[in-house]
Amino acid sequence: MESVQELIPLAKEMMAQKPRGKLVKLYVLGSVLALFGVVLGLVETVCSPFTAASRLRDQEAAVVELREACEQQSLHKQALLAGGKAQEATLCSRALSLRQHAS
């Protein structure tokens, strides 16, 4: 069935042949399921831009969180390196001062 215009003559022809009740119920069930599928397809088409936008926002938020974590980690490493260098400088100056006293 390519169009609704072909569906109406088919329904008229079926009613003219006086089909059994079970057959009519089967056709009605098939038609309802097909209509339900069309409605779901339309809803999905209408709502897909919104879901794509929310996915994009979620991805951007995840990227921002990763960048912040990397920045915090690099700052922590820099602080450790700076603290280590200061500690080494203190140890070296102590070692030199102790050596001067020993000689």
From Swiss-Prot:
| Keywords of the record | Apoptosis, Mitochondrion
InterPro entries, per database record: G0S2
Record's GO cellular component terms = mitochondrion
Q: Which domain of life is it from?
A: Eukaryota
User: What does the UniProt entry say about where the protein is found?
Assistant: Mitochondrion
**A Gene Ontology BP annotation from the UniProt entry:** positive regulation of cold-induced thermogenesis
Stretch forming the signal peptide: none
Alphabetized Pfam families for the sequence: G0-G1_switch_2
Task: Quote the function comment for this protein.
Answer: Promotes apoptosis by binding to BCL2, hence preventing the formation of protective BCL2-BAX heterodimers.
Under the subunit heading, UniProt states: Directly interacts with BCL2; this interaction prevents the formation of the anti-apoptotic BAX-BCL2 complex.
Supply the name of the protein. Answer: G0/G1 switch protein 2
User: What is the native source organism of this protein?
Assistant: Mus musculus (Mouse)
